[in-house]
Amino acid sequence: MKDIFNFFEKPKDPLSFSAIRISLASPDKIRQWSHGEVKKPETINYRTFKPERDGLFCAKIFGPVKDYECNCGKYKRMKHRGVVCEKCGVEVIQSKVRRERLGHITLATPVAHIWFLKSLPSRIGNLLDITLKDLEKVLYCESYIVIDPKETTFQRGELLSEDRYQKALDEFGDDAFSAGMGGEAVLGLLRGVGPASKEHGEGIPGLANELRAEMKEATSDAKRKKIAKRLKVVEAFVASGNKPEWMMLEVIPVIPPDLRPLVPLDGGRFATSDLNDLYRRVINRNNRLKRLQELNAPDIIIRNEKRMLQEAVDALFDNGRRGKTITGPNKRPLKSLSDMLKGKQGRFRQNLLGKRVDYSGRSVIVVGPELKLHQCGLPKIMALELFKPFIYNKLEEKGYVTTIKSAKKMVEKERPEVWDILDEVIREHPVLLNRAPTLHRLGIQAFEPVLIEGKAIQLHPLVCTAFNADFDGDQMAVHVPLSIEAQMEARVLMMSTNNILSPAHGKPIIVPSQDIVLGIYYMTRERAFARGEGKVFASPEEVRAAYDQGEVDLQAKVWVRMDGKRVETTVGRVLLYDIVPRRLSFESINKVMDKKQLQGLIDLTYRLCGEKETVLLADRVRSMGYGNATRAGISIALDNMVIPRKKVDLLERATREVDDIQAQYTEGLITIGERYNKVIDIWAQVTEEVAQEMMGEIGTETAVGTGKDGKREERRQPSFNPIYIMADSGARGSAQQIRQLAGMRGLMAKPSGEIIETPITANFREGLNVLQYFISTHGARKGLADTALKTANSGYLTRRLVDVAQDAIITEYDCGAMDGITLGALVEGGEIIEPMGERILGRVALDDMLDPFSGNVLVKANEEIDEGKVKLIENAGIDKVKIRSVLTCQARRGICVECYGRDLARGRKVNIGEAVGVIAAQSIGEPGTQLTMRTFHIGGAASRRAEQSTIENRNAGLIKFNNVSVAKKRDGTLIVMNRNGEIIVTDDQGRERERYGVVYGAKLLVREGQKVEANQLLAEWDPYSMPIITEVAGRVKYGDLVDGVTISEQVDEITGLARKAVIASKDPDARPRISIKDEEGRTKKLANSDADARYMLPEGANLVVNDGDEVDAGDVIAKMPRETTKTKDITGGLPRVAELFEARKPKEHAVISEIDGVVAFGKDTKGKRKVVITPEVDSKLRPDLAKEYLIGKGKHISVHTGDRVRAGEALMDGAANPHDILRVLGEKELARWLVDEVQEVYRLQGVKINDKHIETIVRQMLRRVRIVDVGDTEFLADEQVEKFAFEEENERVLKAGGRAAQGEPLLLGITKASLSTESFISASSFQETTKVLTEAAISGKVDYLRGLKENVIMGRLVPAGTGLGAYKHLDIEVETPVDAVEEAEEALAVGAEE
């Protein structure tokens, strides 16, 4: 008994246990733990407030209420310790035992434990092979169950209704068979669980053998699955040594009374824990049942009482899981034992994972513009309170006081000595500042406190970005690290000066913003005709002197001699160069410094000069920036919003164009969808043009002054318009916002996300009219509503990510992986979105990288690719690089240093023990929240680019076609007839410069081998609809196109013209199609294949030709409208990221080809079309290896007869299904796809995240394997196992000469992956607590406490960073200063003698 409680006491040595096991408690075990039986439902006597004997608070069972004092008062004080009072039976001991002693209730009848009964799948039901419904009938006394059929025809476990049971008794006699109802019956069945025939053995192991045998014989898949499910439960019992009958409770433990307290309120009432009510209910019903049984009451009454007891115990363990929720007097559901653990307010998340911290305070923050980067201003009153113990200690040490009490008085009086001592205590003692919400690790940083008057904490302005803090009333919390170790960690790891780079992307996060940027930008700008323009100076010092004397203006253009060269620059830039480290060249700042340039400057300084210089530079830049922003005296006036003169003309032109399109629509040339899209494009275009005009007018001005010859002259120069300056420098605002102030607001979106086609032509300076204002409110309101919802969503995403990745820790130096991934530049639509250099920076090379021309080794295998190496690789023209990656790391637990590469926040290789999983989760989750909050800043102005409908090349060169098949029209234009064709532009040497995919139906404007200039149009197509094009000339013949059945003639209300569109038909065999016939009426064949020229029409296609029309090759016969574009917002973004990480199957996912091959169409079946893909082997088609795919009729198939497809290519329109990609293309391809998809969402928002973070999460999602063939291993078919467990088991079997199991990789979503982790503590504190614990208890799981979360919950140091096991056993040798001094003296003496 004592042992179990040592577990709850604070372990003296944190290593007192290394693993934790959970299993079922047997009735004997419960009695062994217990200190006595609770027999009465009474709690305490309301008059004396003493606990009632044998009641729920009984002192005899649970211990004394007051320390060392028995209940009746006979024994008091320490001297009687350990005595048991003979009068009241209470042991004289500390009262805290009331927190740890258990009692028990012996039940009059066994009851089922609701977790094992109702938690799906029902464990008791599974084991007995009875459905849950039947089981409940038995337990809640509604039916009898046969326990032992003996000689009768009944089956064991068969249900009998009351009538049937009575009949059977009459028929067979009383002793012919045994049947029962209620808990006893089920207990009997559980005790007798075993195989049907004796050949397999006895009991549970026998049952397992029998099921195994059945599984081998089972033919149908469903049956196999069912047996496997049951076998899993049975195996768990075999392995864990739990007995099935322990799932029924005969004894219930009663938790210690101080954990379910009863507190007297004033007014004679009591506040009580709900558990007491639940226990009272159980005891009452139990006692009543005992009494009824002693009285031999009628069966029906006893049965009812048993049912009620079962219900009471159910409510105690998990209220509301079955039947009505039991409520207290105030109609509130009572909190049961399960509810104590579950959810955000449960034990796990409220008290174990998040605790309140002593030695902490919070206050409003204000800016501290003169602090150094490593400092924060701490209010004196606050510091006095936080550092009290230290002050008391120092006061005693210095002899000001002798006792703690007098020290306390002295501090309360705030005597002058106290302040001096406070200064001393605080020196070199860092404090932690935290701003909620803490979204990434930079939300808590350490600073050295500086004492200040006032009550607000002062925060350094440069760390605001990391905290996402502003000074509009934000509050921050202060925490004091107490122990020397904690202070060390705060100083070395968490000091703000050690966190210059962001862990998410490795660029500086301590970056000047707002006013500072404004000031530096202002001082590095050049102004025409400024005082002292054109002067020549011999040194920067002279410039400074001239500026101080007022001889030259800050923005005057001057010549200065720098490092022996004459440089053209401005006064401001020379002054700026004064504060920059000397290792940086003057070129690096001799330009207009905006926010981007400043970030680059900080980055460069960090790389070249190291951390210390960077910190000094940051502080100097801050001071200089604030100073110059003040001197600049920038303000905003109405006249600064310049409305472009051309605006009126542009609007008139747009209105005319819109009218034209309306006319075309009225004549029936275009569809309603095309009209809408075109109108929206016109307005989007005009808004852009107005904005450009406005930026042109705001951004430049004419300066007038006297030239060298004294004549008046004019010069154009970038404007000094304050609004323009703010946006251009990156200090505040964006072109997007200025456009709304002075251009036109443009298109707005409805709440549904569609764009309203009438734009707001006014801007805020002109003011909006009522209608425009009303349209605006849509967007603004949606923005606010979104924000509220998204913040919660994003927080939840982060929580799931952290949970899945919490045990990804760097555990070893090199795992010896021979495999890696290949990275190149990220290209989209012919544009390089992310150059290769950025993607490979800080990674480790897999193989030697050779220069393609000279053959020299540029980077050795397993060497880190740093900035210098990236330059080498780029200059050598290498475009694909093999690097090591987290995805291919072979470390058994965790990840190795080499596969991870650079620690982005430190700029060097990662340390062993770094919790890279959590960092990855935070890096992905943090911008999620930021983005969600960022929706409404533009006020819902619809930003959407005109659809791309052309291809232009960027470089001059030669045209090459790759896999492009064309149809030539009569007029000689070429129309592209297949999907995955590409146009390649090569240079003279034939090296590929750019590559563009061409859309089906595009018109080619160039020929193979043609020379093209830069920016020439190569191809164009209709962006609003996808055409269906005929490849042969002939006459159109409709097939299955029946009006009102498969097509509908829609008469457009506005134009009065009819249009034919294909609709979904009720007839499953109808196949709407268009065939092309020749003169004789035979269907024509397609060129170079023997397939017929028949075109199936998907739902929604608009017919362009009529029955009997003559068509030419390359003509459009039908159009598929593309969806009207919605605005892209992270709204699409956050759910998209979540669905990618959850690995959800998209609703209408595309069918993809599993092999390379040639497309043909087979016979249609059941309203589905059959696509057959035949592989080529040695350039011969092999129909025997062909794969067939059925695609629903309404879907648009994007391949055509004779197309060559690659494995993994989509055969129809639709979203890709990650599980298919994994199955067909393998893990690496899937990982690449996931990384690209996630990155795309963030890139749209301009958020940078390093690929390796996403890879880390994907690695955690791919940890498992599904067993396909068990071989001779212990696994079950279809079981999911960890990859490494799978490999180990296979090695073991192969060594023994058996057959290894076969598995296929499995992609789990992050929630599933978190719940299937090895650690049950971690999984249960994440979600579905009861389910996880139920499963763990049955299989007697052992948690080896390897992850971070389990250790936090158990109250131990986390096994990462400084908490790594390796650091716990270090021997530290301390050299005493005395020895050192003596040694030094000796050395000096010897030196003197010599």
Curated annotation (Swiss-Prot):
Write the record's keywords in alphabetical order, separated by commas: DNA-directed RNA polymerase, Magnesium, Metal-binding, Nucleotidyltransferase, Transcription, Transferase, Zinc
Q: What EC number(s) does the entry state?
A: 2.7.7.6
Gene Ontology CC terms, in alphabetical order: DNA-directed RNA polymerase complex
State the Gene Ontology terms under molecular function. Answer: DNA binding; DNA-directed RNA polymerase activity; magnesium ion binding; zinc ion binding
Residues involved in Mg(2+) binding = D470, D472, D474
> Could you mention a single GO BP entry for this protein?
DNA-templated transcription
Reaction(s) catalysed by this chain, per the record, are: RNA(n) + a ribonucleoside 5'-triphosphate = RNA(n+1) + diphosphate
Cofactor(s) required, per the database record: Mg(2+); Zn(2+)
Q: Which domain of life is it from?
A: Bacteria
Q: Which residues bind Zn(2+) 1?
A: C70, C72, C85, C88
Tell me the residue numbers annotated for binding Zn(2+) 2.
C815, C889, C896, C899
Q: Name one Pfam family in it.
A: RNA_pol_Rpb1_3
The record's remark on the cofactor is: Binds 1 Mg(2+) ion per subunit. Binds 2 Zn(2+) ions per subunit.
How does the annotation summarize its subunit structure? Answer: The RNAP catalytic core consists of 2 alpha, 1 beta, 1 beta' and 1 omega subunit. When a sigma factor is associated with the core the holoenzyme is formed, which can initiate transcription.
Q: What family does the database annotate?
A: Belongs to the RNA polymerase beta' chain family.
Protein purpose: DNA-dependent RNA polymerase catalyzes the transcription of DNA into RNA using the four ribonucleoside triphosphates as substrates.
Protein name listed in UniProt: DNA-directed RNA polymerase subunit beta'
Gene name for this UniProt entry: rpoC
